[in-house]
Amino acid sequence: MTAVSANGKTTEKHENGAHTNGTTNGTTNGSMNGNEISHVQKLQPVYYKPPQNLETFELSLRNHFEEKTNKKFADYREFHRFTCDNYGIFWEDLLKLSDVKLHQNYNQVIDHNLKINERPRWFNGATLNYTENVIERGTATDIAVLNASIEETVTEYTYDNLRKDVYRIATSLRNYGIGPGDTVCGFVPNTYDTLVAVFATAAVGAAWCSASVDFGPAGVLDRFRQVHPKVLFTVNHVTYKKKLIDQTDKINEIVKELPTLEKIVVSDTFTSVKFDATKYNQSDKFSSLEEFKTPIADVVLPFVYTPVPFSDPLFVMFSSGTTGIPKAMVHTVGGTLLKHIEEHLVQGDSKKHDRMFFYTTCGWMMYNWMISFLYSKGSVVLFDECPLAPDTHIIMKIAAKTQSTMIGMGAKLYDEYLRLQIPFNTLYDLSKIHTVYSTGSPLKKECFAYINTYIAPGALIASISGGTDIIGCFVGGIKSLSITPGECQCLFLGMDIKSFNYMDEEIINSDEQGELVCVTPFPSMPSHFLNDTDGKKYRDAYFARLEPFWAHGDFVRVNHSTGGVEMLGRSDATLNRGGVRIGTAEIYSVVEKIPHIADCIVAGRLVEEGMDEEVLLFVKMVPGQELTHSIQAAIVSKLRNDMSPRHVPNKIYAVDDIPYTSSGKKVEVAVKQIVSGKAVQKASSIRNPESLDHFVQYRL
């Protein structure tokens, strides 16, 4: 392992992965000053266009199917249609061409007689191991992981380091009897130790479930109680905004309520405070990570991974829980792996030299998505701190220092960069970046322009959208198409996406807004929900609305000239004005540009016995500003002129704060329920749950 300096050059080497100091050279403190602001001119983006003689995995895959079927696909859209019409062949050939290692072969890809709502199983008879597939492909001496800190130190771990650490933890888990059918939990930050724990868990055939360290005990228990874990990985301290935060009280409260726990493993690698078992209740169950690790000399080599059936559990993921106890979704070993291979290798064209830096916590599905990137034989960059305070530049500093080639984060963070107008690429070397990911909420057109001006001109902007429900994406980016600002470039291969109008009819050759629907099975559907023996929760979540099709809950507009998709917000938060549906993102795109408005959220409130909706707009003002009549008039005028009279709200109110989930999504449905007079539980996944109190006074 090596630590690298601010210019990306190696400065010191440590076999144990530790760094001797936190100093860096040639970096700024991230504060905005007059010189930076003066550099900002009108945005002049350089948008991505496919180069001549483009060579990608997707084009190779397209050529494979052309030769196999004696067809010629005119473009990506024709190829996409083929992969949906022939989804069994597509996923089978992708599994073979991407070299997925199976211990036992399959006897059936899928039963094509079963519809998507019947949840057919994939690759029946096949056995494999997720960890083996993901971490055994890379060259031993190549860098697998770069662990970055708020102090701007970066510690590197090779594939050999990673494998040996996984073997040591996996051997210890086996010694505690952990294997298929068991669940291991992590109350953890996004660090190297966590990554090792995830891979070690999957290496022995057990399922992994995690919660972010910014969750309170109640939020963690809402999730972990459902899975009955035997082992818990956690940390004694975390840092946030450069402040050291003791986790002892949280851990004690969590462990007290989880009687199935047999072992609690505490990491102290990335803090200055060492593990002390006497601080914990039930201290006999606790050990440090170093104590828990089997010495490498005692690990039986070559290490033997536990093969499990394709549809065995890999990850237990949770719904946001914004309107109740989070639903526990079980994602399969093979389905997750194959979907992530398609997204990283085919859609993303990830290669061995790539470095992926996606800013995420371990409570967001993007973490699970990110770690599968190692299947490409490249590197992942890990960072778990505040991205804006005290240093608004920290993400880009780390991207530059690690020479990341692919970066990603929630769309709200790009919104903040746009507001600050920081010309990052004039301050740091971001020249290696060729792909920029955004997700969590719709990415504004202005953010496209900002990214392709001040972060990575000419880079592919992959605005991706899917969800925890599929542990992946329905739509996103592809290198064989040009960028259209404001749109997700394309429908992903093998994902048979349609848009249905308010009469539940498919929208064909029209740019009409509609509900995003998937009509054929795909591998990364949850196998089941926990505590759902009759399957009712599963059916209600996806099929009750448009059975037999999967209704995902997104309101979209498919651009039939480009093939791109504009995400308009959640369909359950979509506004209904006289029978015309309006996506909330359209209102935000106008209102958030108006001076003196910091943020906003909109909700529909049913009136006239549910036949129509009254639209309420709530705005958060910039500190020191008030919602005046002139600002209200400006909102009305801009919405009427830029959108339509139907976009004009019935009422506009000022509130102190806007509620967000921990992954950066506005909590629209909860606000809608509150103003409609319904009781709403304050979910632990809401970053600022007290903000919901502001809306109670506006209920019916």
Swiss-Prot record:
Enzyme class: ligase
Expression by tissue: Present in most cells of the organism.
CDD domains registered for this protein in UniProt: AACS (cd05943)
Catalysed reaction, written as an equation: acetoacetate + ATP + CoA = acetoacetyl-CoA + AMP + diphosphate
Subcellular location: Cytoplasm; Nucleus
E.C. numbers: 6.2.1.16
A GO cellular component annotation in the UniProt record: cytoplasm
Family to which the UniProt record says this protein belongs: Belongs to the ATP-dependent AMP-binding enzyme family.
Name the UniProt record assigns to this protein: Acetoacetyl-CoA synthetase
Organism per entry: Caenorhabditis elegans
Organism ancestry: Eukaryota, Metazoa, Ecdysozoa, Nematoda, Chromadorea
Gene transcribed to yield this protein: sur-5
